[in-house]
A protein has these predicted regions:
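Multi-pass alpha-helical membrane architecture of UbiA-family
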Residues: 1-286
């Protein structure tokens, strides 16, 4: 029974999607320890903080969006809609995640603790943005913009140019793939006055904006290599990333649910893994 409950909660918060969130923050950690001492405890605490913050964000998103989700054929089978998890339990998950997040921050400096409400505010406001702005995808990207600087601030009390560039690359990466994913709901969004770029600009223009966002992502990631003077392994990684982005956008030349899901889940998972590996090898070995 307990295992079934854990499985339901894991599905509710899409725990496996942490694969998208962790690499940018962990890459930031690797860049920081390139110039500072490595600490396994700090690494674990950062991972706990990231996962708990993301859990809060996903739970509160599901809670706030439950009325919209109940009408959307794509989302009406989610756990909160089908009563597999109650609203009370959903709020409890978000509350516990928030407590764990703040406990994990207590080992770091006061600056990151004082700035932490910004992270929570972005997570909390994001679900409402689709009700009033077509830039909702970029508001989601703010989470990834904040994460790398937050890691460095937690460890050093400041943040550097390369960390800011990493956060900015995460912003454009997430904004770009969220625009792609929103194509799945284009008809529903139009009928229900939900704001998204595909519903406003159409599929063709949205794909162009997504592609430009991902080109900027690659440029920013390459710029980190120059700033940090990273070696051959890093540039091989950049080349692979560029190839994966091309593959992702090649998949959505023909728009259908299967291709979009492949582009969103499979390709972005591969991009996340390659990103983390290239930073790990470049900072720890070279």
């Amino acid at each position: 029974m307990a295992l079934e409950k854990i499985k339901i909660i894991s599905n509710f918060i899409k725990f496996e999607h942490s694969l998208f969130a962790l690499p940018f923050a962990l890459s930031a950690y690797l860049l920081v320890v390139k110039h500072n001492q490595f600490s396994l405890l700090n690494l674990l605490l950062i991972m706990i903080a990231l996962i708990s913050a993301r859990t809060y964000g996903m739970a509160i998103n599901r809670i706030i969006d439950r009325n919209i989700d109940s009408k959307n054929p794509r989302t009406m089978h989610r756990e909160l809609i089908t009563k597999k998890i109650s609203a009370r339990d959903a709020y409890l998950v978000s509350f516990v995640a928030l407590i764990i997040f703040y406990i994990s921050l207590m080992s770091f400096n006061s600056i990151v603790f004082l700035l932490s409400p910004i992270v929570i505010a972005v997570f909390t406001i994001y679900p409402f943005t689709k009700r009033f702005t077509y830039m909702c995808h970029h508001f989601l990207g703010l989470v990834y913009l904040i994460a790398p600087p937050a890691v460095e601030i937690a460890l050093t009390g400041s943040f550097s140019l390369s960390i800011f560039l990493l956060g900015l690359s995460g912003f454009f990466w997430v904004s770009g793939f969220d625009i792609i994913y929103a194509i799945l709901d284009i008809e529903f969004d139009k009928k229900n006055n939900i704001f998204s770029m595909p519903s406003k600009l159409g599929i063709k223009q949205s794909k162009i904006i997504s592609w430009v966002s991902h080109l900027i992502t690659i440029i920013l990631i390459c710029s980190i290599g120059f700033v940090e003077n990273l070696g051959l392994i890093y540039w091989i990684g950049c080349t692979i990333l560029f190839g994966l982005f091309i593959r992702e956008h090649f998949l959505i030349l023909k728009i259908d649910k299967n291709n979009i899901n492949k582009a969103f889940f499979n390709m972005n998972a591969q991009i996340s893994i390659v990103l983390l590996i290239m930073f790990a090898l470049s900072t720890l070995i070279q």
